[in-house]
Structure formats: structure tokens, C-alpha cells
Design a protein with these regions (language model features):
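Carbohydrate-associated surface elements
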Residues: 160, 182
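Acidic donor-binding loop of glycosyltransferase active sites
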Residues: 278-293, 309
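Nucleotide-activated donor-binding/catalytic signature segment of Leloir-type glycosyltransferases, i.e.
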Residues: 239, 247-272
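Conserved donor-binding/catalytic core segment of Leloir-type glycosyltransferases
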Residues: 155, 195-213, 219-223, 236
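Short His-centered aromatic/hydrophobic patch
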Residues: 99-105, 126
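Short hydrophobic beta-strand element within catalytic cores of glycosyltransferases
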Residues: 301, 306, 310-313, 323
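Glycosyltransferase donor-sugar binding loop
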Residues: 51-53, 234-249
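Conserved acidic donor-binding segment of nucleotide-sugar-dependent glycosyltransferases
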Residues: 324-326, 330-337, 346-352
Length: 385
């Protein structure tokens, strides 16, 4: 489905999220870009987000309300958000409430039983993992299903997550839309990459340090390469928010093979990350399923593609909608380390293929825009294509 015309509501639009700047990640980026695009289209936008240090706050084109919560999905955050919503129930009752991620959805699952708290329009966006989580038990499935029934619209970023949502919650069929990921609006226009002789080929991974992101899988695949190849590769790992002792495992594995140079950068601000992309030759993010967590899309693939980096990734979840196999990158079936190593070796030896995939990726990354997504989400319910 798509919205072909826009009827802006006279009532305000409240975007409520636990993940917003200065938090990094795909969901935080999605929420920020939808808020900015909606304000640019003339909507009266107010964002409710997790607490943040005042010195980190930006100047936004919409009203910002920081809530007294950390932004996790634990019980304390749920209770604090519920109190805020109940206290403002009268103003929310006549407004459009947009929830782009699972944290506030959990709170809404319980508040939906109170007739006094029913927003005029409720709009939800699903990314993938929460669909599996919400359908993991009969109670959660019932609560989530009831919330979806109350929603005016729901959206997903990919066809994969749309099909997953409809499989678990088929009653969403008459209200579901696609709102695909796009490049950040503050993303610098990247000039074409100049050919340059290099002694080293840099493989880059950007993502939080978590088993689902597959840094350890990529590292082990690179360590499988022949010595002559391995000695000319550097593996750069960008990301923080360590999960358990995962970083320790990564560093231990990196130290087991001194022939491969591995660098850990930690978190890097967006304005500095662009320079890291430009110094790299191949982007790798070999995500895997981890419990009920799945890669629904991956905005970081678009950013890498915009820097004309060929991509190596696992063919899992919605990744194939962010990386076109053989066109913008190479997709490998998970749990096939030899095939993954072969993909790296292929790109290492074939500079022409790296350039072709990278240039195709530049065009592919620019195909979607946030304004179209905002129009799709918030157009009048009577406007359908």
C-alpha cells in the first residue's frame, strides 16, 4: 500500500520512543528522520523521548519532551512512561500517537484497556525482532494483536518484516504499509571514489558489539584466508554498547592470529564515521539470528553503499532488501564459513568487481526518502492508492 495524497491532521502528532538521539542505531535514526520529515511536511510534531544530557541536545524543527526514563524495556521504564501517558491522556486523546519501536508499545499494550486513554489515531512501526518477541507467548500475542486492531495504520521497513507481521498477526492486513529505510538527511554527499593504489585492503564493520551483528563470524572468516591475502587485509571494527563479554571474545580471537591486523575503534560520531568509510574498501556485516532477535533491514548497509563500498553480508531476515546480491554486494548463507571466506577472497582479488558493486550501491542507497515515508504514515485514513 502507499498513500498517494496528504491530508495533514489539525490535531498534533506525538512521536513516542525510547530510542532517540543521542542513542545511536537504526531505530533511533528512523525515529529522528520520521520526526524531521513530518515537521517539514507541516505536521505539528512533538517528540517524547528518553532522558539525555542537556549539553547533548540538538536544536530540533519540532518540540522535544525528554521523559524521566533511561529508555530500556524494563519495568521501571514502562511504569514511568505509563505515568506520563496517563497524566497527558486528555491531550493525547485528540491527537495522533505514533510509536516507532517496541518499548512504548509494551506500555500501550496495558493502557489500551482504559477507555479514558485512547488516542484519536494510533500508528505503529515494526522492525522485526519485536514481532518475534510479541508472538512468543499466548499472552503477548493477544496483547499485541489487540493493540494492532486499535491502530489506524502499521508499517514495516521491508517486505520480509511485513510478511512476518502478517504471518503472526494476520488482522493487520487491511492497514499495513511499507516505510523503507533511507539515508540520514544529514548524510554528507559522497563524491565518487578515486582509484588509488593501496598496500592494504580495509574491511569495515559498523554496528554495536553483539553476537547478532556477527563481528566474530567475520573475523574468523578473514582468519581463514591464505596467508598472502590475510597479510594485506586490515579488519576495522566500529561500535560500542558491548553485550556481555563479547568484546573480550573478539579481542581474544583477534590475538590468536597476528597475521591479520584488527583495529577496534569503539563508538565514533557520525561526522567522523564518514572518514572511516572513505578509508575502507569492503563493508561487512554478517548478522545472524540470536534468540528472538533478527536483522529486519539495516540502515548501516545503505550508508556503506552510499560510500561506494561493496558489501558482504548474510542472506538473512530483511538484509536482501538492503543489499542486492551480485548488484551491490555479495550475500552468503549463514553458517557457511568457507563460503564467507571465499566471498572475501573474491573481492580482495577483483578490484573491478569491488568498483562495480560500489557504484551500483551509491545509486541504490539514494532511492528512498523520509518525506514519502512520513506521508505514507500520517496521510488521512481516507487517502489510499
Amino acid at each position: 500500500m502507499s498513500a498517494s495524497s496528504i491530508t495533514k491532521p489539525s490535531s498534533p502528532l506525538y512521536l513516542i520512543t525510547h530510542e532517540f538521539y543521542p542513542v545511536s542505531g537504526g531505530i533511533a535514526t528512523f525515529a529522528e528522520e520520521i520526526a524531521k520529515a513530518s515537521a517539514g511536511l507541516g505536521y505539528d510534531v512533538e517528540v517524547w523521548a528518553q532522558s539525555a544530557p542537556p549539553e547533548r541536545e540538538k536544536k530540533w524543527p519540532f518540540r522535544m519532551r525528554r521523559l524521566p526514563l533511561k529508555g530500556t524495556q524494563d519495568l521501571t521504564c514502562q511504569i514511568r512512561l505509563a505515568r506520563e501517558l496517563i497524566a497527558c491522556r486528555r491531550q493525547l486523546r485528540h491527537a495522533t500517537v505514533y510509536i516507532p519501536e517496541p518499548g512504548p508499545m509494551l506500555t500501550m499494550m496495558f493502557l489500551q484497556f482504559f477507555r479514558a486513554f485512547r488516542p484519536k489515531r494510533l500508528i505503529l512501526t515494526f522492525h522485526g525482532t519485536e514481532i518475534l518477541s510479541f508472538s512468543s507467548s499466548p499472552l503477548r500475542r493477544w496483547l499485541a494483536g489487540r493493540l494492532i486492531r486499535h491502530a489506524s495504520r502499521v508499517s514495516t521497513l521491508t517486505t520480509y518484516t511485513q510478511e512476518l507481521l502478517l504471518e503472526r498477526f494476520p488482522h493487520a492486513a487491511d492497514k499495513i504499509f511499507l516505510t523503507p529505510g533511507a539515508l540520514r538527511t544529514d548524510f554528507a554527499v559522497v563524491p565518487p571514489r578515486a582509484d588509488r593504489a593501496k598496500d592494504k585492503i580495509v574491511v569495515l564493520t559498523v554496528g554495536r558489539l553483539h553476537p547478532r551483528k556477527g563481528q566474530l563470524i567475520t573475523l574468523k572468516a578473514l582468519q581463514m584466508l591464505p596467508g598472502a591475502v590475510k597479510g594485506r587485509i586490515e579488519y576495522w571494527i566500529v561500535g560500542g554498547r558491548n553485550w556481555g563479554n563479547y568484546e573480550e571474545k573478539l579481542r581474544e580471537q583477534a590475538g590468536s592470529d597476528p597475521a591479520l591486523n584488527v583495529r577496534f575503534f569503539g563508538n565514533i560520531p557520525d561526522e567522523e564515521l564518514a572518514h572511516v568509510y572513505d578509508r575502507s574498501d569492503i563493508f561487512a556485516l554478517t548478522s545472524v539470528s540470536h534468540g528472538t532477535s533478527v536483522e529486519g533491514f539495516g540502515l548501516v548497509y545503505l550508508e556503506a553503499a552510499a560510500h561506494a563500498l561493496p558489501i558482504i553480508a548474510h542472506n538473512i531476515g530483511g538484509v536482501s532488501e538492503a543489499v542486492r546480491d551480485g548488484e551491490t554486494g555479495l550475500l552468503v548463507t549463514p553458517d557457511r564459513p568457507a563460503e564467507l571466506a571465499a566471498a572475501f577472497e573474491k573481492l580482495f582479488h577483483d578490484g573491478a568487481l569491488r568498483r562495480r558493486l560500489g557504484e551500483a550501491g551509491r545509486a541504490f542507497a539514494a532511492r528512498n526518502c523520509w518525506e514519502e515515508n512520513a506521508s505514507t504514515l500520517f496521510a488521512s485514513a481516507n487517502d489510499q492508492a
